[in-house]
Amino acid sequence: MKNIFTVLGLFFISSLMAQSIASIAYYKVPREEAAQFIRSHQKFTDLSSSDDRLLRGGGVFAHVHADNYTYVSYDFYDSVSDLEKDGPIASAALKTNIDALKLSKKEKEALTKEYRKYNRTIYYNHYDQIRMANPEMGWNFQTADWTKKKITTLSKFKIKEGMQDQFFDGWKKGEFKNKQESGFVEAITGSWHLYGEGDNIHVYTFFDSWDNFASFEKASSYDVTKDMGENEKKFWSTVETHEDEILMFIGGIDQTTGKFYFEK
């Protein structure tokens, strides 16, 4: 079984013991080049693998709805310091692993050409941020099946200054509780913004099928002419801006092998 619980769970759950860090990169890839890009991503992720890496795991989502990017990748570290140190280690591993392949001149030229194209796409067509796990926002990772693709909603919140406690109180009593009790949600997690372009809070809600996602949305529908309850009013009064996206979790790094794999 692919060890995806280790990939995601270590970031979102074991942060109870340490403040785990996620380095997040958003890639804007032309649609006609998307399949080749993700194949190259798998190849060069594998070629950058080594026992010396400080990377704890990683995952990739395909963008489905809202915003304007193709893929988003998550690399997980114990600290910002480990993140900063890992780049040179990855570069050294890439060189060592390519040398070990003992490629012919023609094969090496082809690989170099592919890498340069992959690297150019990343350099010119991405933006990034660093986030920190919030363990109090996690639910059900130990029982979720991380060997399968996930339909994922990402809710982004910018919180009004000084209203973080009220935000979390309202969120836990409302949305968090409702999702756990709905019968359609498989897992939930969240993170704080640390560096780069991003909102204060990200909330990830995972569904194991489009049917369950649709059923949850249907069950959550409400009468737009009816006033909110008191908890909802208090919660939304803390929010300065909010937006939602839909993603598809498609694969990650197996921490046992260090290799990238695609979900089924």
What label would you give each PLM region?
Residues 1-20:
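Bacterial Sec-dependent N-terminal signal peptides
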Residues 18-227, 233-264:
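Short S/T/G/P-rich N-terminal loop/turn motif that feeds into the first structured element of a domain
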